[in-house]
């Protein structure tokens, strides 16, 4: 391995017709680590501002994957409902802010993506551990946690409200369903 035949970059070569050792890239070649042509997807930003939207539709599969990844990477500090009282915090680590405070409820999805990617304060970055699609799944799940704590009647579909209104309530002498 110490002595091997090779050409140095930009060295002349009698082997190739053009006399160069360096070969041109094959058409449509993407340099390793440089496919990041979708700025919104890879940075969470539109221009210099954090993106107010998601780069792809948020499906139940995206939310389920985000939930799974959140439980692994985020819940140790942020806890399972996003109040910032995870097991690590209960053992002395600095408490992160709750996702339910106004500042974070009003933050753009791109902000959360950026924080997961680059870290913030004492939070480390997770760019190496969490792939880009999973980071967006985590952001979607954080939004779901926020909505779960601050939902209004206007957030409930009319059909669901109707079901709730027509559901019989236990009266005198009736037992509630134990289901």
Predicted segment positions?
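Periplasmic c-type cytochrome electron-transfer domains
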Residues: 2-61, 130-141, 164-165, 171
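A general structural signal marking secondary-structure boundaries and capping sites
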Residues: 5, 81, 120, 146-149
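A generic secondary-structure boundary signal that marks alpha-helix termini
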Residues: 10, 39, 75, 121, ...
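Residue-level signal for alpha-helical context at structural boundaries
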Residues: 19, 84, 92-95, 130, ...
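Sequence/structural segment immediately N-terminal to covalent heme-attachment motifs in c-type
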Residues: 60-83, 96, 111-112, 117-118, ...
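Flexible coil segments in periplasmic/lumen-exposed cytochrome c-class electron-transfer proteins
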Residues: 71, 103-109, 124-179
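Histidine/lysine/aspartate-rich catalytic loop segments that bind and position anionic ligands
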Residues: 79-105
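Conserved beta-strand positions that form and line the central face of beta-propeller blades
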Residues: 98, 122-125
């Amino acid at each position: 391995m110490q002595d091997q035949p090779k050409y140095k970059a930009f060295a002349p070569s009698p082997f190739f017709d053009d006399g160069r050792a360096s070969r041109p890239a094959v058409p449509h070649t993407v340099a390793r680590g440089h496919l990041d042509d979708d700025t919104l997807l890879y940075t969470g930003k539109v221009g210099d501002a954090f993106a107010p939207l998601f780069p792809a539709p948020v499906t139940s599969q995206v939310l389920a994957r985000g939930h799974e990844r959140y439980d692994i990477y985020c819940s140790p500090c942020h806890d399972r409902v996003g109040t910032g009282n995870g097991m690590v915090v209960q053992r002395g680590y600095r408490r992160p802010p709750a996702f339910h405070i106004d500042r974070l409820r009003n933050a753009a999805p791109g902000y959360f993506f950026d924080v997961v990617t680059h870290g913030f304060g004492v939070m480390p970055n997770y760019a190496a551990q969490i792939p880009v699609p999973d980071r967006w799944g985590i952001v979607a799940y954080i939004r779901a946690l926020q909505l779960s704590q601050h939902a209004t009647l206007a957030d409930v579909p009319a059909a669901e409200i109707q079901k709730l209104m027509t559901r019989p309530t236990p009266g005198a002498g009736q037992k509630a369903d134990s289901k």
